[in-house]
Curated annotation (Swiss-Prot):
This is Cytochrome b6. Keywords: Chloroplast, Electron transport, Heme, Iron, Membrane, Metal-binding, Photosynthesis, Plastid, Thylakoid, Transmembrane, Transmembrane helix, Transport. Component of the cytochrome b6-f complex, which mediates electron transfer between photosystem II (PSII) and photosystem I (PSI), cyclic electron flow around PSI, and state transitions. Heme c binds at residue 35. Pfam families: Cytochrome_B. GO terms for cellular component: chloroplast thylakoid membrane. It is found in: Plastid, Chloroplast thylakoid membrane. It is a multi-pass membrane protein. Heme b 2 binds at residues 86, 187. The 4 large subunits of the cytochrome b6-f complex are cytochrome b6, subunit IV (17 kDa polypeptide, PetD), cytochrome f and the Rieske protein, while the 4 small subunits are PetG, PetL, PetM and PetN. The complex functions as a dimer. The gene is petB. Heme b 1 binds at residues 100, 202. GO terms for biological process: photosynthesis; respiratory electron transport chain.
Length: 215
């Protein structure tokens, strides 16, 4: 094993990378509230794992969605646990994200030179809320259906472009299969892809600039 490691070390300088990760300076004023972003990331990773597991059983059609969720909850081994963890971690992720935003704002972490870190963080916050809105509808029960109807109906109050926006969100004039398909695509593909782009940017900027000092 030693010879194998030495070959990789010679070419990739693994030890230097490890030293850089483990020896980063942490300011003395840092406390538990500075862990909220990391907790949000942990919740997101739990979401990815449990969400991926549920895609094996979920059927994104208006006739089968609810039944597939019921099957997952009652027939699949530990299916109830997987879905419950997904729901609990989703709620925890939103809560931790909100607290993280407040902590950064109250401690001035958005100020120069960390403006871009703040911008990517706000984008990630919007993506987090979007995950919640789209995921809430996927069981296609009464709560999910009416939540979608209300959320997608909000833009209708906008002059001129309101109605086209509603049709764009729903896929048609009314809520139906097109709406569920769009929300499922957003929840399982588009939003995760955008998160996979902005999250590394966010963490790399934090890594480069370090944690902001006390007020």
């Amino acid at each position: 094993m030693g010879k194998v490691y030495d070959r990789f070390e010679e070419r990739l300088e693994i030890q230097a990378i490890a030293d850089d990760i483990t020896s980063k300076y942490v300011p003395p004023h840092v406390n538990i509230f500075y862990c909220l972003g990391g907790i949000t990331l942990t919740c997101f990773l739990v979401q990815v794992a449990t969400g991926f597991a549920m895609t094996f059983y979920y059927r994104p059609t208006v006739t089968e969605a609810f039944a597939s969720v019921q099957y997952l909850m009652t027939e699949v081994n530990f299916g109830w646990l997987i879905r419950s963890i997904h729901r609990w971690s989703a709620s925890m992720m939103v809560l931790m994200m909100i607290l993280h935003v407040f902590r950064v704002y109250l401690t001035g972490g958005f100020k120069k030179p960390r403006e871009l870190t703040w911008v990517t963080g706000v984008i990630l916050a919007v993506l987090t809320v979007s995950f919640g809105v789209t995921g809430y509808s996927l069981p296609w029960d009464q709560i999910g259906y009416w939540a979608v109807k209300i959320v997608t109906g909000v833009p209708e109050a906008i002059p001129v472009i309101g109605s086209p926006l509603v049709e764009l969100l729903r896929g048609s004039v009314s809520v139906g299969q097109s709406t569920l398909t769009r929300f499922y695509s957003l929840h399982t593909f588009i939003l995760p892809l955008l998160t996979a782009v902005f999250m590394p940017m966010h963490f790399l900027m934090i890594r480069k600039q370090g944690i902001s000092g006390p007020l």
